[in-house]
Amino acid sequence: MRTLPADLTHYKTTPEFTQESVPRGLLRNHTTAAGVWGRIVVREGSLRYVIEGPEPETHLLVPGTPGIVVPEEPHHVALEGPVRFCVEFHR
């Protein structure tokens, strides 16, 4: 699994989302802005992280296994059941 580059600075964290409160936009393909990295942090349950592209990747995120979002890379999440998670942003 990917890791964040060491020279990034955390600047924002979303509120905690659940399977009931996750914004619909996160369930559809979207990207971060140029230079913005994301770190999907699952606090409870599990979440499927799908990276789109010529060779799509799918990862099951659980507590202790974050998903790293590369700038401008199309991706989305899919619900697997009960979950609590947030997204940290770095640049």
Residue ranges of model-derived segments:
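A short, N-terminal "cap"/entry segment at the start of jelly-roll beta-barrel domains
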Residues: 1-32
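Short acidic, glycine-rich loop/turn motifs
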Residues: 51-53, 91
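Short histidine-centered beta-strand/loop micro-motifs
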Residues: 26-34, 50-51, 58-60, 77-79
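Short, conserved beta-strand segments within well-ordered enzyme catalytic domains
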Residues: 41, 50, 68, 86
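Ligand-binding loop in jelly-roll beta-barrel domains
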Residues: 71-91
